[in-house]
A protein has these predicted regions:
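Short, thiol/selenol-centered motifs that function as redox-active sites or metal-ligating centers
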Residues: 61-68
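C-terminal binding/interaction regions
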Residues: 1-20, 82-141
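Alpha-helical support elements that line or immediately flank enzyme active sites
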Residues: 68-78
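Phosphate-handling active-site elements
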Residues: 53, 76-86
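Structured beta-strand/loop patches that form or line metal/cofactor-binding pockets in enzymes
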Residues: 16, 20-55, 59
Length: 141
């Protein structure tokens, strides 16, 4: 089970967080914690006319937390900040295997594929969703 949970695609996604340097021109910041396991995510973004033009994530936690943060970085690029709450809800529903007819704001759910092993482990969903939960918590710097 652990082998499939920490498969190569998921670990590659997690590595994105470590490869992207801190933003020098960040305009907003959000911090969230998972009190159950101690994971912590700090997301900084640069916004121009409500569009996320750059982001960086500092994730202190498990590989699943880092993978979710890496996915957040991929999905947030050049997207309105308001879309991120919708994507948070969509990813949460996908993890829970709740089928929706509507496709979420111009993405293919194939982007979630590296996280497929996590679907079966409900108590790890919050780890994956932690970076996405920053969507409504950003404050100007």
């Amino acid at each position: 089970m652990l082998e499939s949970l920490y498969q190569k695609q998921l670990l590659t996604l997690a590595s994105l967080v470590r490869e992207i340097p801190a933003l020098k021109a960040a305009t907003h910041r959000a911090v969230v914690n998972n009190p159950v396991c101690g994971d912590r995510v700090i997301v900084t973004i640069e916004i121009d006319e409500n569009i996320i033009v750059a982001s960086a994530v500092e994730a202190k936690g498990c590989a699943l937390c880092e993978a979710g943060a890496g996915l957040w970085m991929q999905m947030s690029a050049n997207r309105p900040l308001s879309d991120m709450s919708l994507l948070h809800n969509d990813l949460a529903r996908w993890l829970k295997r709740i089928a929706d007819v509507d496709k979420p704001i111009g993405i293919s759910r194939d982007i979630y594929a590296p996280l497929t092993p996590v679907r079966a482990i409900k108590n790890r969903h919050k780890c994956v969703l932690l970076a996405f939960s920053t969507a409504d918590k950003f404050r100007p710097l």
